[in-house]
């Protein structure tokens, strides 16, 4: 499997009481993959406005390729209002319509896609969803990052996206909800993971449980790893870091259990700092190289 990864979806500004931070799950995942030495690019869209200009400048600052960072002529750059509780757990108000609601790729038929990472949020709009499905059909390997943000999801929408996928990542609350849609009465994380993986045909199912650790199901085997105790600054982007850490290790052909350990270390690193984006390339502590 080639280690060239395209991460599709939202690039945005997380707006907190203390200021704004660059984010969006696909961008966060791509950033951490690059920091771990994986060749990764973002497919997204910004507005023709000052906030979009700041995003492009940030990409340039971090040497992030802008090959597929498109500009919409009229829709604005995305902003998300973030609220943090006393434990640093984030909740989001996601405004619409924004530039990434209408992502289209010129000459898509000529694009070669090795690993395609996409999320459920960007699929809230028909135009972007159509582009996702076209990319998904072309990809050699697909990664579906489930982020259920009310009111931007439905059973029908998630089912449409979840079939013909190799690797799925979600949290324990999302697992419980989706399992209840298809297998009401089935209880327990491991039972639900196995049932959904068999139903949809997933090869890898990754479930994060916050401070309670994480599970992965691969090749019929389930592995669990405890979380790394840290002082939580906030939880913004922690799940994205986890996915990136796991995928980076998987592309380097580590075992599922080892991938979990590396993912947990990166998620803890991000959770202990404010915001989703922090450089860690070459970190001996994280050992992602």
Residue spans for each PLM region:
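Substrate-binding N-lobe of the ribokinase-like
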Residues: 5-7, 14-80, 84-89, 94-100, ...
């Amino acid at each position: 499997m080639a280690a060239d990864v395209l991460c599709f979806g939202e690039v945005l500004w997380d707006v907190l009481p203390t200021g704004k931070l660059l984010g969006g799950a696909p961008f966060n995942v791509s950033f951490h993959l690059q920091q771990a030495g994986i060749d990764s690019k973002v497919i997204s869209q910004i507005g023709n406005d000052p906030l979009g200009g700041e995003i492009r400048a940030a990409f340039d600052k971090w040497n992030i390729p802008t090959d597929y960072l498109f500009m919409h002529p009229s829709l604005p750059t995305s902003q998300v209002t973030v609220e943090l509780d006393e434990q640093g757990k984030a909740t989001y108000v996601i405004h619409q319509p924004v530039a990434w609601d209408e992502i289209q790729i010129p000459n898509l038929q000529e694009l070669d896609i090795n690993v395609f990472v996409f999320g459920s949020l960007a699929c809230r709009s028909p135009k972007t969803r159509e582009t996702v499905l076209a990319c998904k059909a072309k990809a050699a390997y697909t990664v579906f990052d489930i982020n259920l943000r009310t009111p931007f999801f439905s059973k029908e929408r998630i089912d449409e996206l979840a079939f013909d996928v190799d690797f799925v990542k979600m949290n324990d609350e999302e697992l419980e909800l989706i399992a209840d849609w298809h297998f009401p009465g089935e209880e327990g994380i491991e039972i639900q993971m196995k049932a959904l993986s068999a139903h949809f045909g997933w090869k890898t199912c990754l479930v994060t449980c916050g401070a309670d650790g994480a599970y992965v199901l691969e090749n019929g085997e389930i592995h669990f790893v405890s979380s790394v105790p840290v002082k939580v600054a906030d939880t913004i982007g922690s799940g994205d870091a986890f996915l990136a850490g796991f995928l980076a290790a998987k592309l380097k052909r580590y075992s599922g259990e080892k991938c979990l350990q590396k993912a947990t270390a990166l998620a803890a690193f991000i959770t202990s700092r404010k915001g989703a984006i922090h450089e860690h390339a070459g970190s001996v502590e994280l050992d992602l190289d």
